[in-house]
């Protein structure tokens, strides 16, 4: 969608002058991306945005001292090193520290305190922070702001302006692409946005006691759940023109082990904050089985393996969230064990398919493909084996020729190449595991769903997160 840039087209007069004073804590969660953090904070400092009522908390999940040393001389900036708790743990640490600071100083009496969550690797104009402050000062107390997301690469098209989840089908992350001006956003009555991405998400600190802290689910889905809980508490999420950032879009990388978190956390959301969507056990399983079947069809056995682990951990309940760093290492190792590390240098000899301009099949060709698949495995004996090179943003098996035996996927946004080869043994093993999981799902879904619903108040409580941070800090000091 081609629209104006994240700041273009709105003058200061489009945003009303502040009525009440706002105290803003910017929380940046980072992991080995010092250059991005230094660039963005320098921009805020040079623009004169930071001050007594606008401060920054940088949560460094790499637990090192380098970033702290580099930012030691910057006023109104505090760095908190900690172990890797993912984006969920990093951003929650920032909210937790902001709550402690507000309670300790009593500054909430003079200003309305807000928290602004920001990714470490975004690009933005400091003016968007000023506009956010003006909007908060005039928009009422029951308001959250989701910054619009623009592609960091030219021509910087709009990618998302808030989003919904589970609306059309269970696993459905739908970007909202109806940007509105500031005044229209404030006047709108019905909330059409479920959540805002944590590249830029702002909310009132005082209401965290009512809404709770985010779920400790490491990455992927933490913002999906948290945004919906704000909506359920009576808050509106708006994403007006003029408040946006530039960031890599989700198709800029080929996703591997992260599908463990996407699967597990989506199931947690469907069982708790998005239970109202009404997706039942059978429908959810149908989509899970279909998606894993697609992974097997493109020979990505690593992705199938981590998705099955995600389902298994959902059925285990909240105890699966314990020892998240150790579990993260296990999941990345699991994907690596099923991936092919050596990419062959034979692209020129392969059947080339451009996924941006996929081949069109005639009716006769489609009928032939259906017949060949129906006659398996007999048809595989006489049909020649195919070795394919796919070029595109998203790896799909939809356009693979019959009897494809290996795929070299060239991910055009990143320039990286991934190799996948058919394995009859792996396919048989995962189909058997999928069949076993189907029975476990039928037996355990109801119990797991209820257990997650009962666990959410504890998992999102101040006390629970305080225990997590205390344990993590103690282990760091011990090392």
Locate the predicted segments by residue.
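Terminal low-complexity segments of carbohydrate-biosynthetic enzymes
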Residues: 1, 264-479
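N-proximal low-complexity "stem/linker" segments adjacent to membrane-targeting elements
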Residues: 1-42, 477-479
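Acidic donor-binding segment of Leloir-type glycosyltransferases
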Residues: 43-80
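Conserved donor nucleotide-binding strand/loop of the catalytic core
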Residues: 72-89, 97, 105
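Short beta-strand-to-loop acidic/aromatic patch adjacent to the donor-nucleotide binding site
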Residues: 109-123
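Conserved donor NDP-sugar-binding/catalytic core segment of glycosyltransferases
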Residues: 123, 127-170
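A recurrent flexible, glycine/aromatic-enriched loop bordering the glycosyltransferase active site
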Residues: 176-200
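Donor nucleotide-sugar recognition loop
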Residues: 198-200, 209-228, 234-240, 257
């Amino acid at each position: 969608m081609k629209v104006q840039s994240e700041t273009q087209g709105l003058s200061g007069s489009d945003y009303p002058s502040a009525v009440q004073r706002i105290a803003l804590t910017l929380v940046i969660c980072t992991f080995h991306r010092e250059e991005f953090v230094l660039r963005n904070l320098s921009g805020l400092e040079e623009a004169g945005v930071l001050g007594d009522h606008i401060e920054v908390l940088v949560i460094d999940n790499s637990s090192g001292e380098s970033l702290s040393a580099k930012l030691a001389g910057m006023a109104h900036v505090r760095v908190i090193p900690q172990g890797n708790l993912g984006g969920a743990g990093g951003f929650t640490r920032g909210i937790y520290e902001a709550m402690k600071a507000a309670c300790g100083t009593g500054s909430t009496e003079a200003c309305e305190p807000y928290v602004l969550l920001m990714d470490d690797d975004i690009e933005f104009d400091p003016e968007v922070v000023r506009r956010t402050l003006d909007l908060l000062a005039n928009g009422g107390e029951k308001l959250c702001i989701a910054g619009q997301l623009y592609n960091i690469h030219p021509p910087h098209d709009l990618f998302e302006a808030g989003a919904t989840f589970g609306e059309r089908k269970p696993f459905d992350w739908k970007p909202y692409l109806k940007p509105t001006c500031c005044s229209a956003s404030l006047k709108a009555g019905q909330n059409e946005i479920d959540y805002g991405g944590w590249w830029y998400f702002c909310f009132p600190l005082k209401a965290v006691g009512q809404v709770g802290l985010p779920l400790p689910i490491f990455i992927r889905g933490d913002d999906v759940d948290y945004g919906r809980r704000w909506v359920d508490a009576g808050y509106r999420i708006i994403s007006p023109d003029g408040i946006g950032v530039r960031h890599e879009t989700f198709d800029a990388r080929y996703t591997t082990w992260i599908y463990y978190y996407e699967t597990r956390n989506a199931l947690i959301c469907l069982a708790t904050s998005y239970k109202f969507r009404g997706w039942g056990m059978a429908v959810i399983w149908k989509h899970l089985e279909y998606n894993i079947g697609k992974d097997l069809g493109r020979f990505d056995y690593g992705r199938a393996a981590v998705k099955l682990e995600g389902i298994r951990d959902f059925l285990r309940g909240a105890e699966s969230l314990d020892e998240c760093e150790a579990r993260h290492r296990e999941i990345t190792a699991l994907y690596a064990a099923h991936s092919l590390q050596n990419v062959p240098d034979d692209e020129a000899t392969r059947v080339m398919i451009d996924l941006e301009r996929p081949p069109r099949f005639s009716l006769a060709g489609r009928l032939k493909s259906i017949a060949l698949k129906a006659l398996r495995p007999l048809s595989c004996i006489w049909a020649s084996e195919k070795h394919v090179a796919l070029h595109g943003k998203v790896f799909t098996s939809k356009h693979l020729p019959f009897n494809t035996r290996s795929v070299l996927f060239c991910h055009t946004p990143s320039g990286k190449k991934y190799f996948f080869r058919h394995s009859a043994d792996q396919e048989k093993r995962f189909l058997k595991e999928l069949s076993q999981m189907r029975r476990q799902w039928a037996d355990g879904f109801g119990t797991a769903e209820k257990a997650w619903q009962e666990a959410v108040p504890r998992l999102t409580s101040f006390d629970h997160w305080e225990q997590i941070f205390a344990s993590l800090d103690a282990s760091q000091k011990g090392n």
